[in-house]
Amino acid sequence: MVFMARAATTSDAFNAVAEPRRREILNYLALEERPVAEIVDALEMEQPSVSKHLRVLKDVGLVHARRDGRQMFYRTNAAGIRPLYEWAATFERFWRHQLIRVKERAEEKSGR
């Protein structure tokens, strides 16, 4: 069986958040809606770069945008982020199991 490498694309949320600066932007937007200028200042990025990343995040449904006069405001889209959360949550059982094993081994070594 021959496997073809998947082309690098930003057509889905997983590929979009593979870029570290986009994750920074999402983290910054996590609690409230913010204007582009504030994102630029807070993350110390160039405005064209922020706008490009926001466009990608919007295209895959991770953020919503709204215009107020001349300013664009962005906020996270919970429905768009949900698939990322659900995927990451599948590992919760793994880590819980690992922590239980560590606890059991520590208790065995301490004679409990």
Report residues per predicted region:
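Amphipathic alpha-helical dimerization/coiled-coil segments
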Residues: 1-9, 27, 31, 82-112
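N-terminal helix-turn-helix DNA-binding core of bacterial DNA-binding proteins
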Residues: 5-48, 71-86
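Short, hydrophobic-biased segments on the C-terminal half of alpha helices
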Residues: 54-55
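Beta-hairpin "wing" of winged helix-turn-helix
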Residues: 58-69, 73-75
